[in-house]
UniProtKB/Swiss-Prot annotation:
L-isoleucyl-5'-AMP binds at residue 581. A motif ('HIGH' region) lies at residues 66-76. SUPFAM superfamilies: Anticodon-binding domain of a subclass of class I aminoacyl-tRNA synthetases (SSF47323), Nucleotidylyl transferase (SSF52374), ValRS/IleRS/LeuRS editing domain (SSF50677). The gene is ileS. It comes from Paraburkholderia phytofirmans (strain DSM 17436 / LMG 22146 / PsJN) (Burkholderia phytofirmans). This is Isoleucine--tRNA ligase. GO terms for cellular component: cytosol. Its EC number is 6.1.1.5. Its main location: cytoplasm.
Length: 945
């Protein structure tokens, strides 16, 4: 820094070295921050950082793409700022830490927006054109918001899943996993949203309470002789009755095709006024009570004995369309926790039902599937054709009542699947889809996808550690991945399918590459406009284009393929060092990325996963419009500053929920002011210091200065170990403690006398400034990852010839040879000082003294404390900030004490110390000898403080 004082002030007769700085006390963050954002863009600071970091070891934090729809919210701010802090910390640690932001662009939310604005009848080409334009507009809007938060990155060259290169890359990734044998087509129940008109990924399902009618339904005996044999009877005592099921989905009854019993559960044949009822023995008493019946158990048998015994459909007497029977199949998933211990099976609408029926030999063509994609029954369905399944529920209950099959019904509130976009109930629905098989063994390894992914989890670092088990259990238990979707705005599964057999064209892999080349030039629109004859020639008449698009989780889940090794391969690399997202992404981006990389590369695309929690209000409640407790990051940035948001995030343990409220923000703002005041003191007292000209070597430093630098070095090492583990809240806590207690409450307080009163160019003052110079260097760099605006503002004053603090690396503190001994000694001294400070406060309360400088103290000390105190000699009073200090040796800690007396001497006009030599010089009657020497003589000699 220059040796010029910042402002000229009226000169005192006896001036002190009281300097100023252009670094203001008030941050005025809402006004200054946008200026820094503008300057960083205009000066291309991100590019400057890249140039400075070139050749270093790379560190890649791969950005999980937010969806290109809507304004950024507080969750976005948390996510992007955490990423920004890590990237900046890694750059400062000496890495080439690149940050390429990205956006997820295809899929339902944008398609819904286009439908809202332009209706549902637009041609596909127009939907795509408008979807691209809409996504581009949303990206630009979000980009401005992220930059405003101080996030540095390659904003002018982000990745977008809708860029032609990326769309083509997805098609090539699909071809690769097909080549390996992971992809198959089949009929399976998948999560289906009627409003989307499409299958949903597991990550697109949320659970909310829903109230439905539950029903206990009687399936009458169709094979009484076989039933009797199963129970070890020669014949049934009576013909009336049957087997009873319980379900929360009456709408599935028309599609019933089987009944499931557990092979080992004991079932009872119970004689009741309603006939013979088959129930799980454990549930007999509870069920009869609910039905208002009494009964006697006639016989019992394990479920295995009843296999393949048939029962009549409960609506058989209501309409000929239901004159069919349901066989008993066995299933280990059946329990006796609720219901009757018997599960009715509609294989089109339940995963376990489907698996059970298929395992018992049911062909796909035999599966009854009357629910259409919009949630209505097909018109030909008996009794309920054309009705919505939800509207049909009460009518089905009524029809069962009329048929004599209804044992009981009541309303039941349970946690039920909903679409995360439409917030409407969804169902399992069997459709013909393309899947990636979790338990398929590909042709290049003997491990299944599930095994490869689970092995990859074992080799991944998790922050926090509990994320490992969460992801592991999800992968271990998940079904096959439904890759296909029935939408327009998405990357096509660009297959040609035989019109009669449904088989893929034998040249599918080759054709996918040809389509990818066209998409690379013209986008996915190239597939929509493609005439099959262009690629198939004479085969075109036998094949049709597959109309399915890829799950958008495949879009983002393959960014390690089409971004890290595709569109941005020159900047990025595979695998990424870190993926960082909210805890919901264990079933989202972390999950899909793991599966695609396991298929493509046999390993995860990341070396480590970091998970952060969600934002809640001060009372721990989830933020919602209905509660009115949401906090808009733009509003906070414009009112308090983005720096306050950044400091709040950094100071909160992100591994759990991140609580925010006006009271919390107020506390964060107060903490920010303390840090800013510390910086202002440092910069002001370095404003006449030029390192090249004024710095003193370590051997010339006063003891307390060596201690302060040794303490700062330890702090930096401690903080860097936290940065290495992506732990920010301990960093903030320790920096704030350092600023308020180690610096403000001790070192800087002690230093003021030396900085202000010794000769401007004295060894004592330059020693202090040299230490402050190193402390400022260290502190600014340590805080730069989270207080980026403030660190840059201070840095430009501190080091005006440097382009930006973000091209620096962490400060190399000079080695202090006696650091260990000093740290031990000054720990003792600070403890003694605390005792003195307490005694001074008691004296002040008793009106014995005013300021501490009015006091003289006598310290009675023993052992190491005595040695430490006496080693400072006459400098002890400066450490205690008293006018005089003496130390008396005692034999034990029990005898230790502090005595305070008011000084009887005059106060020096300049240094405010009370000294016997004030007025000793007749020409300067208000000065002490120390100040006279500092102003007009050779200056005082300091050794310790």
């Amino acid at each position: 820094m220059s040796n010029k004082k910042a402002d000229s002030k009226p000169q005192s007769r006896y001036p002190v070295n009281l300097l100023d700085t252009p670094f203001p006390m008030r941050g005025d963050l809402p006004k200054r921050e946008p200026q820094w954002v503008k300057e960083w863009q205009e000066r291309k600071v991100y590019e400057t950082i890249r140039a400075a970091s070139k050749g270093r070891k790379k560190f890649i934090l791969h950005d999980g793409p937010p969806y290109a729809n809507g304004d950024i919210h507080l969750g976005h701010a948390v996510n992007k700022i955490l990423k920004d802090m890590i990237v900046k910390a890694r750059n400062l640690a000496g890495f080439d830490a690149v940050y390429v932001p990205g956006w997820d662009c295809h899929g339902m939310p944008i398609e819904i927006q286009i439908e809202k604005q332009f209706g549902k009848s637009l041609p596909a080409a127009e939907v795509m054109q408008k979807a691209r334009a809409y996504a581009t507009e949303q990206i630009e809007k979000q980009k401005v918001g992220f930059r405003r938060l101080g996030v540095l990155g390659d904003w002018d060259n982000p990745y977008k899943t809708m860029n032609f290169t990326n769309e083509a890359g997805e098609i090539r990734a699909l071809a690769k996993i097909m080549e390996k044998g992971y992809v198959f087509r089949g009929l399976k129940p998948v999560n289906w949203c009627f409003d989307c008109g499409s299958a949903l990924a597991e990550a697109e399902v949320e659970y909310k309470d829903k109230t439905d009618p539950t029903i206990d339904v009687l399936f009458s005996f169709a094979e009484p002789e076989k039933t009797a044999q199963a129970f070890g009877l020669s014949a049934l005592p009576r013909e009336e009755g049957g087997i009873v099921i319980w379900t929360t989905t009456p709408w599935t009854i028309p599609a019933n095709q089987a009944l499931n019993l557990h092979p080992e559960i004991v079932y009872a044949l119970v004689d009741t006024p309603r006939g013979l009822l088959i129930l799980a023995e454990e549930r007999v008493e509870a069920c009869l009570k609910l039905y208002g019946l009494e009964g006697t158990i006639v016989a019992t048998a394990p479920g295995a004995k009843l296999v393949n015994v048939r029962f009549n459909h409960p609506l058989a007497s209501a309409h000929p369309g239901y004159k069919r029977t349901a066989p008993v199949f066995l299933g280990d998933y059946v329990t006796t926790e609720t219901g009757t211990g018997i599960v009715h099976s509609s294989p089109a609408y339940g995963v376990e039902d489907f698996v059970s029926c298929k395992a018992h030999g049911m062909a796909d063509s035999d599966i009854i599937n009357p629910v259409m994609g919009d949630g209505r029954y097909i018109e030909s369905l008996a009794l309920f054709g054309g009705l919505s399944i939800w509207a049909a529920n009460p009518q089905i209950v009524e029809a069962l009542q009329g048929a004599g099959s209804l044992m009981r019904t009541e309303k039941y509130t349970h946690s039920y699947m909903h679409c995360w976009r439409h917030k409407t109930p969804i169902i399992y629905r069997a459709t013909s889809q393309w899947f990636a098989g979790m338990d398929v063994k590909p042709n290049d390894t003997d491990k299944t996808l599930r095994e490869t992914a689970l092995e990859g989890i074992e080799n991944t670092a998790f922050y926090p550690a509990w994320g490992k088990q969460r992801l592991f259990s999800m992968i271990a238990n998940r079904p096959d991945w439904t890759l296909s979707r029935q939408r327009q705005w998405g990357v096509p599964m660009a297959f040609f399918v035989h019109k009669e057999t449904g088989e893929l064209h034998p040249r599918t892999l080759e054709l996918l590459e040809e389509v990818a080349q066209r998409v690379e030039k013209a986008g996915i629109e190239a597939w929509q406009t493609l005439d099959p004859r262009e690629l198939l020639g004479d085969d075109a008449n036998m094949y049709e284009k597959n109309r399915d698009t890829l799950d958008v989780w495949f879009d983002s889940g393959t960014t390690h393929w089409h971004v890290l090794r595709g569109s941005h391969k020159d900047e990025l690399q595979f695998p990424a060092d870190l993926y960082l997202e909210g805890s919901d992404q264990h079933r989202g981006w972390f999950h899909s990325s793991l599966l695609t990389a396991s298929m493509l590369d046999g390993r995860p695309p990341y070396n480590a996963l970091l998970t952060h929690g969600f934002t809640v209000d001060g009372e721990g409640r989830k933020m919602s419009k209905s509660l009115g407790n949401g906090i808009d990051p733009h509003e906070v940035a414009n009112r308090l500053g983005a720096e306050i948001i950044r400091l709040w995030i950094a100071s909160t343990d992100y591994s759990g929920e991140l609580a925010i409220s006006e009271e919390i923000l107020k506390r964060v703002t107060e903490g920010y002011r303390r840090i800013r005041n510390t910086l202002r003191f440092l910069l002001a007292n370095l404003s006449d210091f030029d390192f090249a000209q004024h710095a003193r070597p370590v051997e010339d430093w006063l003891e307390i200065d060596r201690y302060a630098v040794a303490l700062s070095t330890n702090l930096q090492n401690d903080i860097l170990s936290h940065y290495d583990k992506y732990e920010f809240h301990p960093v903030v806590a320790k920096l704030q403690t350092f600023c308020s207690e180690d610096l403000g409450g001790f070192y800087l307080d002690v230093l003021k006398d030396r900085l202000y009163t010794t000769a401007a160019d004295s060894v004592a003052r330059r020693s202090a400034q040299t230490a402050l110079y190193h402390i400022a260097h260290g502190l600014l760099r340590l805080m730069a990852p989270f207080l980026s605006f403030t660190a840059e503002e201070a840095w430009k004053i501190f080091q005006p010839n440097s382009e930006t603090i973000f091209t620096e690396t962490y400060h190399a503190f000079p080695a202090v040879p006696d650091a260990g001994a000093l740290l031990d000694k000054w720990t003792l001294l600070r403890a003694a000082r605390s005792d003195v400070t307490k005694a001074l406060e008691e004296a002040r309360v008793a009106n014995l003294i005013g300021s501490s400088l009015q006091a003289e103290v006598e310290i009675r000390a023993s052992g190491a404390r005595y040695d430490a105190l006496t080693s400072l000699g006459d400098d002890l009073k400066f450490v205690l900030i008293t006018s005089a200090a003496t130390v008396v040796k005692v034999d034990s800690e029990a005898e230790e004490a502090v005595e305070v007396i008011a000084s009887k001497y005059l106060k020096c006009e300049r240094c405010w110390h009370y000294r016997a030599d004030v007025g000793a010089n007749a020409e300067h009657p208000t000065l002490c000898d120390r100040c006279f020497s500092n102003l007009f003589g050779n200056g005082e000699i300091r050794s310790a403080a």
